[in-house]
């Protein structure tokens, strides 16, 4: 049952005000209550401005990224997602997300199987909005690089057949020299050898590969390659994303996953305006991050935790939407996507160690449906 449908406008506003850090403390226990929700982009707006003018914004579809349902069959997953009242899906086609719900080779080889696969989504009124093949096609190990480059190409071919316009992934990260065997994530240009590493990576590996890959995508009718700005890869913030876009072309854009930008100190609304006004946001992951101020003060921000056993010493960890930053903050984030005319979906990716799996998806969907309804002046 869609629990959000029973909220009236008054209770929804109370929910928007009260969620976020308070919910995190209630669900996760006292050691998380010291977390801070970070900046407050909602402070820019008058608290009385709850909704947008009629006709001012598109109702951005809310969806989910499928790896969180790897324990379910395709049919079971679709039943579950439709039951949450969601409208779209992001489907893994290889690389880190895997292919649990998308047998890429079979679908490329057999049009009848492709139609039957797509019909399952149509029957559940779910749009296949994006295909995701996060990998490292510029890995210094040539076997890994070739494997991930092939996964990308097969994803492009499948997107062409399905009429999907957006492919999501990582920029990748090369080694630091022609003889390296492991990736080298350099972010600081001193001592001098790090400047040499960065220059070599971009000029010799990253830009040449993505120019070729973007042409392949373009030749098959795909014009939106959405890079998640993720630590460990050469594109990890808006500046590096725009650098690659400037070098390769307008096929390069962002998968704007704010969970990786909160801890870097980025203002989410500023990021959306910066990239969105250039038409450079192609996809948006909905995932939160909670910052633990006491630990940030002691250890800095490069101190992430992925498991509950490490949280007492962590500076930050992933949370479901509304459990790291307030629902009012997320309302301003969704408002910003509407303001810049974003044409993609809001894709829930749940990696919350406290609300794992489907629980976090359901909580995030509840928050997002209600903030969207509040902005549009409608019932969730």
Question: What is each residue range found by the language model?
Answer:
Residues 2-23:
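N-terminal secretory signal peptides and thylakoid transit peptides that target proteins
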Residues 92-116:
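Glycine-rich, proline-tolerant flexible connector loops at the mouths of alpha/beta enzymes
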Residues 52-57, 78-83, 108-129, 156-161, ...:
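Acidic (Asp/Glu)-rich catalytic clusters
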Residues 71-81, 147-156, 266-274, 330-332:
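Short, acidic/polar
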Residues 31-63, 67-71, 79-80:
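C-terminal segment of N-terminal export signals and the immediately downstream linker at the start
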Residues 59, 88-89, 131, 190-327, ...:
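Acidic/histidine-rich catalytic cores of soluble enzymes
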Residues 19-31, 47-48, 76, 120-124, ...:
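Active-site acidic/histidine proton-transfer and metal-coordination neighborhood
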Residues 77-95:
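Catalytic domains of carbohydrate-active enzymes, especially glycoside hydrolases
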């Amino acid at each position: 049952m869609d629990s959000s449908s029973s909220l009236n406008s008054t209770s929804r506003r109370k929910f928007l005000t009260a969620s976020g850090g308070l919910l995190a403390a209630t669900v996760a226990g006292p050691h998380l209550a010291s977390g801070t929700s970070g900046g407050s982009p909602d402070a820019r707006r008058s608290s009385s401005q709850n909704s947008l003018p009629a006709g001012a914004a598109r109702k951005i579809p809310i969806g989910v990224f499928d790896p969180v349902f790897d324990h379910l069959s395709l049919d079971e997953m679709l039943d579950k997602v439709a039951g949450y009242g969601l409208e779209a899906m992001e489907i893994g086609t290889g690389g880190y997300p895997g292919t649990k719900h998308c047998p890429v080779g079979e679908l490329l080889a057999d049009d009848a199987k492709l139609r039957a696969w797509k019909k399952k989504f149509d029957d559940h009124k779910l749009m296949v909005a994006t295909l995701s093949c996060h990998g490292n096609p510029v890995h210094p190990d040539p076997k890994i690089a070739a494997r991930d480059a092939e996964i990308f190409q097969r994803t492009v071919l499948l997107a062409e057949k399905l009429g999907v316009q957006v492919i999501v992934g990582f920029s990748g990260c090369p080694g630091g020299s022609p003889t390296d065997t492991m990736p080298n994530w350099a972010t600081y240009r001193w001592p001098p050898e790090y400047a040499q590493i960065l220059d070599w990576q971009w000029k010799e590996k990253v830009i040449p590969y993505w120019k070729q890959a973007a042409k392949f995508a373009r030749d098959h009718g795909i014009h939106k390659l959405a890079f998640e700005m993720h630590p460990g890869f050469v594109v990890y913030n808006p500046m590096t994303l725009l650098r690659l876009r400037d070098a390769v072309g307008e096929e390069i854009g962002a998968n704007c996953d704010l969970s990786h930008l909160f801890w870097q100190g980025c203002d989410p609304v500023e990021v959306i305006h910066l990239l969105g006004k250039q038409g450079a946001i192609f996809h948006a992951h909905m995932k939160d991050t909670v910052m633990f101020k006491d630990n940030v003060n002691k250890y800095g921000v490069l101190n992430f935790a992925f498991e509950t056993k490490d949280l007492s010493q962590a500076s930050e960890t992933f949370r479901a939407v509304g459990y790291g930053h307030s629902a009012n903050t997320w309302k301003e984030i969704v408002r910003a996507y509407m303001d810049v005319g974003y044409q993609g979906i809001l894709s829930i990716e749940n990696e919350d160690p406290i609300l794992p799996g489907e629980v976090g998806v359901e909580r995030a969907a509840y928050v997002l449906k209600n903030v969207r309804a509040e902005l549009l002046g409608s019932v969730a």
